[in-house]
Structures are given as C-alpha cells and as structure tokens.
C-alpha cells in the first residue's frame, strides 16, 4: 500500500519546506523506492499563472501544461520525476470543483460545508496522485504556516487520513525555526514548542521535527525539544544553513532522516546510493574556473522570479567545473543609462521570459550590445521575441519594428499574437502551455547542440514570430533553426555571424537538472567560459 508523508511548516514562512520535501524524496528514491510529490497552496487563485512574480516568484510549467508553484521545480530537480497538474492544488481549485459538483447536484441537496465536502475534496486530490503514479510513497507539502486560517482545511484533511488509512501509513513531518538571538548568543526553542502545540491542538502529532537553524543544535536542546514536543529524540533533525541547496539531501542523510521515515512507515529498503549526488556537490564546492553572466529582466529585485533560469545556469556550471556568477541587471535601468555601462565585463548575456511593455527597450538594447560586441547570448521566450525585434530594427532596417503586444500600430509587427489566441479574452490558463515537439533544421548550431532531429520542450506564450516577416529577417542573416513540425511556428532563432547567439520560444530551464544540465545552457556557459 502507498504510504503518505505530510510536510507542514511553523513559526515563519519561507523556511524551506519545499527543499526539505525535495531532499527527502531524493533520498527515498535513491533507496530504490518510487516517490510522487505534490504541493497544496492555500491561496484562492486557481493557479499562479496570472499572479505577479513579485507576489509569487516564477511560474513553473509542467509537461502537461500546468502553471504551478516554483517548489515543483525543486521537486523535479531533486527527485527527477515529472510532476503534473495534479501535483499542485490550490484552494481555488478545491472550491471550484466542490461548487461545480454542487451545481450538478452531486451532493443530493445536502448542505455543502468545509467538513466534509472541502476536506473530502482535498483528500481526493491526494489519493489521485497515488492512483496516477502507483508510488511507494506520496509526499505532500502543505503551503503556508501552521496557525494560518487559510491552511486549516488542509490540516484537518491530513489529520483525517490517519484514521482513514491507518496511522502506520501516514507520517507527519513539521519544519520549524530555531532562531538565534545575537544579543544573548543563544538558540531559542520556544517558537518551535508553540508551533508544535498549535499543530497538536488541531489534532496532528508530528512524527519528525526538522529544525532550521543558523547554528548546530546541542544534544541537550534536542532532548528538550523531544520532551516538550513529545517527539522521539532520534526524530529531532537539525537542518543547519547550507552553502548550496544541493547539500541538503546529504545533510539529512547524515542525520538519519530516511532511516527514521522507513522505520515509522514500516518499510524496508537498501541504503541510499548517493555516490553521484556527492560527486555533483563536490563539483559545486570545487570549481576550477568562473564566469559572470548578466540576466537582464524587469523582476530582478526578486531573483525567485527567475529561479529555474538561475538554477539552469548553475547546473551548466557544475558540468564545466565552473562557478557561474550572476549579475542581475534591471532592464529599466538600461533605458536610463547605457547597456555598455551596466553590462561591461560580463562573459554572457541572458534575457529571460516575461510579459508587458515595461523594460522592453532596455532588453532590446542589451541584446544589441551582445550582438554588436560578440558576447554570447541566450534569449528565452520574450527574450527570443525581443532578439527578433532588435534584429529587425538594427540590421534589417525596419524602423520602429515591435511586437503587437507592445504597439498595436507598429509599422513592422515582427511579433504577433498566435492565431488561436485572437478570440481568447480570459487571461488564466489560456496560453500555449506545456510540452510540444520542435523540429530542428539540419546544419545549424542548435542541431549540433541537441544531436537530434526533433526535441520536446515546455512552452508558455501567446505571441510568436510573424511569418509575414520571416523571409526578410532571414535575408538579413537571422536563422530560424527550429520550428513546429508543420513549420508554421518559429521555435528557435540563431545568428550565424556571431560566436554564440541563440534564442528559443520555449523554456529550456524547466528541464535542467543539477546532474544533467540542459544542452542550451551547457553550451551557452561553455561559450561564456571561452569569452572571458
């Protein structure tokens, strides 16, 4: 029977529940167990697709086209199992489903209530992941912090599951903070005690307590936590701040967390084989070279807005035994000064995805700087579209060329709305989303990089290269080296008269892994190392 692990958080938010769940999943998978993982987000939005990156960070896109929380990116990178639309559930989705059932008459005229209707729907979403994947273990992260009113239905649902399927099949793991007070030079356990007390008041007794801390926890403090929280001493796990998130699986392995999990759930499995993972972490900690790459965007004040892009660059650095230093450049600042001033000295320039007119001219200037100064360039989604606009304006002589997203009256709308998008008015969940095939053109840079004729990549966009201008752009020297299988949609552009200039409509960052970097990022970082 499938076992279920529930990860909750207390004291403060952003403690690293997602990393904890991912790291545990990594260990269990490396012990030969099959693992599925999901996250519940308590907000009422259906998904984060229409939320500002300043509010939520990046939107991670799955193969099946779900727009999800950035923690799902951590899940895939650590566990290397694809997540799906069932892997991220919001309160909005739960209530949407329940209300639709009520309208259909599924509840036979009964009064619809949080208990049992909402809690049953939550449990159904957990069981659905188990039915879909048939794993040995399902790990479910509960977003938010214990004590938040929004999280109460989820906590009640997972409390009920202990009775529904038997306590031997359920494990509760609570992540909490042990703050350090500089004034007294002490670690304090009281916030954690109160967090566990709050959780127990709901009816959940944690089996494992994961303590986030800046400093190591003494044995006496672990004994104190075990006593006051009624948790076995061996199940008090310290998680000291690490230099790299990829050290976390090794740290909790040293604490014996995986053994404790298997003991509580009554499972047997061989020890985790972390040989390759250790080698990867060793490469992170012992780089032999360094490269600096500028990420030019408009959300750079919050790096989480470009989390997968930054991680993909670091993954490529791992492969090349290089430290990738990221220079975050606000594209709006380029508009007010000069690209040369803000980009001087970088070995590569990357323009990631985004939406809206703000900062666009700065991105275009950054791309021009990369093209004219032969600096390796990688554009992603909007980064490809702005690369086409820059080329049209400054090489092909199309004065004021633009995207119809930014200027509906542009004389040269080299980027235009996808035909199937023109009748769509709703914003949420209506873009071209998920994995699609890309046909590569022979004898191009990208065909040599991928070593394949057809690749499969994840997308999230409404706009495309306007086919009306393709011939003129190609005449100017731009190469459309990847298209949809029918040739209608441009997927990749490159500029042969440049050491390394590639841009993709898709998002390659979503398929990068720390031990298997994405080909485009791998070769981009390689080019930047040669350009130092």
From Swiss-Prot:
CTP binds at residues 13, 148-150, 188-193, 224. It catalyses: UTP + L-glutamine + ATP + H2O = CTP + L-glutamate + ADP + phosphate + 2 H(+); L-glutamine + H2O = L-glutamate + NH4(+); UTP + NH4(+) + ATP = CTP + ADP + phosphate + 2 H(+). Allosterically activated by GTP, when glutamine is the substrate; GTP has no effect on the reaction when ammonia is the substrate. The allosteric effector GTP functions by stabilizing the protein conformation that binds the tetrahedral intermediate(s) formed during glutamine hydrolysis. Inhibited by the product CTP, via allosteric rather than competitive inhibition. UTP binds at residues 13, 188-193, 224. It is an enzyme of class 6 (ligase). The active site is at 381 (nucleophile), 507, 509. InterPro entries: Class_I_gatase-like, CTP_synthase, CTP_synthase_N, GATASE, GATase1_CTP_Synthase, P-loop_NTPase. Residues 1-267 are annotated as: Amidoligase domain. Pathway: Pyrimidine metabolism; CTP biosynthesis via de novo pathway; CTP from UDP: step 2/2. CTPSs have evolved a hybrid strategy for distinguishing between UTP and CTP. The overlapping regions of the product feedback inhibitory and substrate sites recognize a common feature in both compounds, the triphosphate moiety. To differentiate isosteric substrate and product pyrimidine rings, an additional pocket far from the expected kinase/ligase catalytic site, specifically recognizes the cytosine and ribose portions of the product inhibitor. Belongs to the CTP synthase family. NCBIfam families: PRK05380.1, PyrG. PANTHER family: CTP SYNTHASE (PTHR11550), CTP SYNTHASE-RELATED (PTHR11550:SF0). Homotetramer. This is CTP synthase. It comes from Desulfitobacterium hafniense (strain Y51). The gene is pyrG.
């Amino acid at each position: 029977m499938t076992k279920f692990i529930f990860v909750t958080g207390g004291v403060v938010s952003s403690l690293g529940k997602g990393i904890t769940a991912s790291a545990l999943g990594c260990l269990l998978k490396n012990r030969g167990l099959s693992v599925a993982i999901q996250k519940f987000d308590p907000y009422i939005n259906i998904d984060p697709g229409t939320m500002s990156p300043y509010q939520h960070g990046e939107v991670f896109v799955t193969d099946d086209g779900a727009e999800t929380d950035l923690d799902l990116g951590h899940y895939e990178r650590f566990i290397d199992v694809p997540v799906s639309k069932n892997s991220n559930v919001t309160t909005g989705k739960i209530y949407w489903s329940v209300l639709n059932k009520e309208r259909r008459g599924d509840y036979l005229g009964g009064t619809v209530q949080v208990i049992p209707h909402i809690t049953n729907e939550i449990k159904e979403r957990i069981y659905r992941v188990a039915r879909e994947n048939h794993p040995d273990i399902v790990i479910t992260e509960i977003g938010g912090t214990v004590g938040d009113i929004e999280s109460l239905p989820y906590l009640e649902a997972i409390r009920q599951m202990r009775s529904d399927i038997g306590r031997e099949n359920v494990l509760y793991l609570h992540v909490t903070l042990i703050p350090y007070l500089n004034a007294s030079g002490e670690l304090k356990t009281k916030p954690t005690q109160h967090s566990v007390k709050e959780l127990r008041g709901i009816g959940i007794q944690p089996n494992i307590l994961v303590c986030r801390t800046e400093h190591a926890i003494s044995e006496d403090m672990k004994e104190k936590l075990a006593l006051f929280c009624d948790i076995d001493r061996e199940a008090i796990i310290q998680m000291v701040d690490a230099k790299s998130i990829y050290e976390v699986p090794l740290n909790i392995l040293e604490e014996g967390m995986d053994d404790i999990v298997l003991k509580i759930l009554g499972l047997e499995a061989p020890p985790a084989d972390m040989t390759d993972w250790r080698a990867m972490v060793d490469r992170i900690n012992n780089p032999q070279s360094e490269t600096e790459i500028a990420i030019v965007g408009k959300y750079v004040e919050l790096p989480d807005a470009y989390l997968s892009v930054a991680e993909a660059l670091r993954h490529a650095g791992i492969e090349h035994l290089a430290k990738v230093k990221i220079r975050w450049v606000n594209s709006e600042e380029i508009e007010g000064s000069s690209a040369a001033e803000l980009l001087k000295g970088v070995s590569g320039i990357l323009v990631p995805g985004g939406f809206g007119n703000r900062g666009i001219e700065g991105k275009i200037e950054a791309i021009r700087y990369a093209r004219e100064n032969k600096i390796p360039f990688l554009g992603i989604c909007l980064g490809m579209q702005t690369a086409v606009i820059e080329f049209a304006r400054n090489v092909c002589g199309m004065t004021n060329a633009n995207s119809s997203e930014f200027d509906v009256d542009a004389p040269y709308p080299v980027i235009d709305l996808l035909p199937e998008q023109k009748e769509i008015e709703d914003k949420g969940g209506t873009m071209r989303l998920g994995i699609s095939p890309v046909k590569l053109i022979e004898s191009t840079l990208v065909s040599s990089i991928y070593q394949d004729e057809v690749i499969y990549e994840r997308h999230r966009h409404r706009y495309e290269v306007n086919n009306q201008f393709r011939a003129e752009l190609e005449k100017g020297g731009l190469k459309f080296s990847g298209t949809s299988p029918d040739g209608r949609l441009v997927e990749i552009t490159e500029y042969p008269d440049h050491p390394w200039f590639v841009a993709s409509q898709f998002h390659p960052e979503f398929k990068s892994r720390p031990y298997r970097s994405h080909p485009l990022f791998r070769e981009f970082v390689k080019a930047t190392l040669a350009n130092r």
